[in-house]
Amino acid sequence: LAQGRPISGHVAFLGGPLHFLPELRKRFIETLKLDDEHVVKVDYGNYFVAMGAALSDEAEVIDVARLEQSIAKAKEAAARETRKADFTLFEDRADYEAFKARHDKDKVRRGDLSAYRGPVYIGIDAGSTTTKITAIGKDKEILYTSYGSNQGSPLKTVVKEMKGLYAALPEGTHIAGAMTTGYGEAIVKAALHADGGEVETFAHLRAAQEFCPDVTFVLDIGGQDMKCFFVKDGSIGNITLNEACSAGCGSFIQNFAEGLHMTPAEFAAKAIDSKAPVDLGTRCTVFMNSKVKQAQKEGADVADISAGIAFSVIKNALFKVMQLKDVRELGDHIVVQGGTFYNDAVLRCMEKLLDRDVIRPDIAGLMGAYGAAILAMEAAEEAGMQQSSLLSPDELDHFSVATSSYRCRGCGNKCLITMQKFPDGGKYFTGNRCERGIGGQKKDSDTPNIYQYKYERLFKY
């Protein structure tokens, strides 16, 4: 905010956050190195701007009637801004049932794991907020699935879920291939000795092709990310991601639901009965909170607000993230996936805005893991591999991670590198900007560094 200019003299801390959060004021004072003499103590910092407006020489004297008229005009303007959307999700219950019946056809083949015999292929999708595991058989049928929250530790979650999978495997089965994908693809592959790792966009595309071989466009909306990719001749031609922030994704809907003391599923179900969805626009979701409150003041019920939020999520994806100009750019075969599309209202808004039907697989939230499992099977068959290198149940029982940090001295950046060491001696590094700090480009030197030796001899334990 200072833009390089020094902050000096007597400083007053104004506004709600600095008024109600004393620790925030304290951190500012420490950072600016202010003493008590130069800190202006303000009793009503949260009202300071309003007080200044009241004391201004430019303030006008108006009567109560004129004030009431101005307030009424402001309310009318707010009401026009929070206008109703120009469509309803479903005309009646029969329309919704027909919608459900159409999408219930997009189902993956499933098999009975307890009765299955033969090779099993594993796909692990370590996402930003959830971990998904899918096991498939030799005919690409799903035998086992797992879907759960990372709880801040994706690696521990994967180990836990893999133990559950091993416990469910009957005699006569063996894991012939395993592949990882998602945010945690690299570390999970290194830790569990998976046979391979794949970028999540390719995993999602491979899964989408099982439902629609001629797919032309895939939209994946997860908990905190959004991926849109165009497909041409079976390959990805262009990719768009929500790089700036995670607003407008699944966690956005979940937060609103929790604010109303409802589960996301209950909140989504309310939207089905909406007859006049509230148009909340596509602005930042922080500002959208105020528009929701305004809609509530005007009498909008939960159903209309839920439908309006679903409408905003899709508008954000199509017109803000993708900056779509012409619907024809998407082609005729559209597949949507990600846990957010379990919400029927979001799916219906997608179809309404595009004015065409789309395909939502019944495993929309597992598509990354399913695609990784298929890729694992294809890689194993191509290599003639019969047994995966994945850690065994006994090795998982004794699995642990030792974490340490050190400064790289390969160049002036002096990167702070975090090393995670596994029981078998394997290592995984993060924080490095190049390969020097992890042993990739060591320089031979005949001269020993006695100070470095002394430091490591004393403290590297």
Predicted regions and their residues:
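Phosphate/ATP-binding catalytic cores across multiple sugar-kinase/actin-like superfamilies
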Residues: 1-7, 101-110, 308-331
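Glycine-rich phosphate-binding loops at beta-strand->alpha-helix junctions
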Residues: 1-31, 42-46, 182-184, 312, ...
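Conserved phosphate-binding catalytic cores of ATP/NTP-utilizing and phosphoryl-transfer enzymes
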Residues: 2-3, 50-55, 101-117, 185-222, ...
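Conserved phosphate-binding/catalytic loops in two-lobed NTP-binding clefts
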Residues: 14, 29-51, 195-201, 351-370
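Glycine-rich phosphate-binding/hydrolytic loop that grips phosphoryl groups
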Residues: 41-77, 206, 253, 362-390
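Glycine-rich phosphate-binding loop plus the immediately following alpha-helix
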Residues: 46-59, 145-155, 233-276, 374-378, ...
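Flexible inter-domain linker/hinge segments
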Residues: 59-123, 127, 380-461
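Gly/Thr-rich phosphate-binding beta-strand-loop-beta motif of the actin/hexokinase/Hsp70
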Residues: 109-143, 215-235, 410-411, 416-420
